């Protein structure tokens, strides 16, 4: 069962963004990036209170994803990436990104906190950050 409402176009957008942000991290890295992306759509907290569609999440400004500013994002999604995106929409979650709303790629080690949000772990080059349950309880809810 889908955890957010999507169209075929949404799956394509999500797949392209997952690839553009995390292709170098392999399938698991793209799935983790996708966890963050879908979490931003499904919660109504912090910087994502008005982000209730995949398209709004993908093109959020300010505070969105840098990959949308690069040409690689605008290349057509491959079927493999579309399947990964559908798995995320269907509710697949992977630690350390299952409750994350942010990730980034630092030059060195992951900081313990990033803009007041706690580090939940690292996968290859990306560090993932979770909101506190006081700031965003719905990200921790069952769906």
Swiss-Prot record:
One Pfam family hit: Hydrolase_2
Biological processes annotated in GO: cell wall organization; sporulation resulting in formation of a cellular spore
GO MF term set: hydrolase activity
Keyword set includes Secreted: yes
Statement: the UniProt record of this protein carries the keyword Membrane: no
Annotated compartments: Secreted
Keyword vocabulary terms for this entry: Cell wall biogenesis/degradation, Germination, Hydrolase, Secreted, Sporulation
GO CC annotation terms, alphabetical: extracellular region
Purpose of the protein: Probable spore cortex-lytic enzyme involved in the depolymerization of cortex peptidoglycan during germination.
Protein name as annotated: Cell wall hydrolase CwlJ
Gene source species: Halalkalibacterium halodurans (strain ATCC BAA-125 / DSM 18197 / FERM 7344 / JCM 9153 / C-125) (Bacillus halodurans)
Phylogenetic classification of the source organism: Bacteria, Bacillati, Bacillota, Bacilli, Bacillales
């Amino acid at each position: 069962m889908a955890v957010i409402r999507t169209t075929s176009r949404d799956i394509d957008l999500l797949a392209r963004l997952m690839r553009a942000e995390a292709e170098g991290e392999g399938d698991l890295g793209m799935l983790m990036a996708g966890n963050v992306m879908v979490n931003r759509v499904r919660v109504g907290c912090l910087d994502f209170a008005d982000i209730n569609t995949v398209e709004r999440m993908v093109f959020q400004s300010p505070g969105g994803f840098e990959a949308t500013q690069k040409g690689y994002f605008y290349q057509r999604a491959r079927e493999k990436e579309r399947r990964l995106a559908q798995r995320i929409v269907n509710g697949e979650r992977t630690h350390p990104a299952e409750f994350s709303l942010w990730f980034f790629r630092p030059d060195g080690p992951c900081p313990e906190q990033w803009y007041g949000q706690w580090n939940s772990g690292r996968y290859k080059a990306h560090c993932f950050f979770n909101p506190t349950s006081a700031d965003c309880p719905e990200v921790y809810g069952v769906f």
